[in-house]
């Protein structure tokens, strides 16, 4: 099902689908990690995250852009920004080690301006620790949602720090999504709530 089929459910405000034919991509909430409170978009450049389209999108929507390059253990850029980081109301989880040295200090400064930081290791993001998402219940209590694979990869100190910002950490075992889909909890929820 393509985006045009969704227009009867969601209002299409900016159709960029024509760029697909030119293999220019900006894969929304996977390519762009949003700090909606402070109107900042964090994005790592990759074949799925076109820098020019990202700049245009941020200008059009009045978001500050924090653009950086990444390098995975294979030497390639990390395909989606939501693999290496998530943004919550009070806290950000991020793997600085996969951000190139030229951009690392800049990103560290930006993320720590408005948030506490939980640093993730490259091994932890391979276990989907960066692919988490914050949600709020009807009582305005904040929760962090991630997979059981990710939860088990967090250390005790990280869990304690997260529980200072969250009522609880919700996790579920989703190995099929992680193995065959290449994503985890955040990819499944995609901020459509």
Question: Residue locations for each model-derived region?
Answer:
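The feature marks the mature, well-folded catalytic cores of soluble enzymes
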Residues: 4-193
């Amino acid at each position: 099902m393509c985006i045009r089929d969704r227009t009867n459910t969601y209002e299409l405000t900016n159709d960029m689908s024509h760029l697909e034919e030119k293999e220019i991509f900006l894969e929304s909430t996977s390519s762009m990690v949003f700090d909606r409170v402070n109107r900042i978009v964090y994005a790592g450049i990759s074949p799925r995250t076109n820098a020019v389209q990202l700049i245009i999108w941020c200008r059009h929507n009045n978001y500050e852009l924090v653009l950086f390059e990444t390098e995975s253990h294979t030497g390639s850029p990390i395909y989606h920004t939501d693999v290496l980081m998530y943004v919550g109301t009070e806290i950000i989880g991020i793997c600085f080690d996969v951000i190139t040295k030229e951009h690392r200090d800049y990103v560290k400064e930006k993320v720590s301006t408005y948030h506490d930081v939980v640093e993730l290791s490259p091994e932890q993001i391979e276990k989907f620790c960066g692919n988490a998402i914050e949600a709020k219940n009807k009582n305005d209590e904040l929760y962090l949602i991630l997979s059981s694979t990710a939860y088990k990869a967090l250390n005790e100190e990280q869990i304690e720090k997260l529980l200072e910002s969250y009522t609880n950490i919700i996790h579920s075992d989703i190995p099929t999504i992680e193995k065959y889909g290449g994503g985890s909890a955040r990819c499944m929820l995609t901020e459509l709530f």
